[in-house]
Amino acid sequence: IEAQKAEPSAYDIINRAVFYVSRMISSQKGREFVNSNYNDIKRVYSIWICMNMSQNCMNYIHFTQESVVGTYQWKGDIDLANIVLIGLAEDLPEKEERYELHRLLGALLSAKLNVDEKFDIIGNEFDIPLESDIRKDVNDMCNLSQGIKEQAYVEGTENGIAIGKQEGI
């Protein structure tokens, strides 16, 4: 599972995900299977969560078998490499069944919601028990994001003042 603050612009994310699942499969040689026992390859998943997308979305990318000439069905597991791309829009989606996962992930990862709002969504909407260790982890996450936001504000203000002094404003 990998989270991205936004869809990368330097490369196509599907290409990176294909690279990851390929490495996960090839790294099984000698560990999950030996010699030519390719039927022992285990299924792998690469899950990507991209925040700040223009819309909430989810795509499942996998192999398919398509007969081009004839109807012969080749043997093998075409479900070995699995990629799931989850896009989270900047704003939390309304409570709607098709956006349940987006709402849960959005609540957990949101920099806009405070810790009590996150607990309300996680506990009340999703019936996830919020024991003290989970509360502490979510609280730490919220404090970390708040700290990063405050530090960025301070640095931005200092840079703005320095630039203003240089330009004689």
Predicted regions and their residues:
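Elongated, amphipathic alpha-helical interaction scaffolds
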Residues: E2-I169
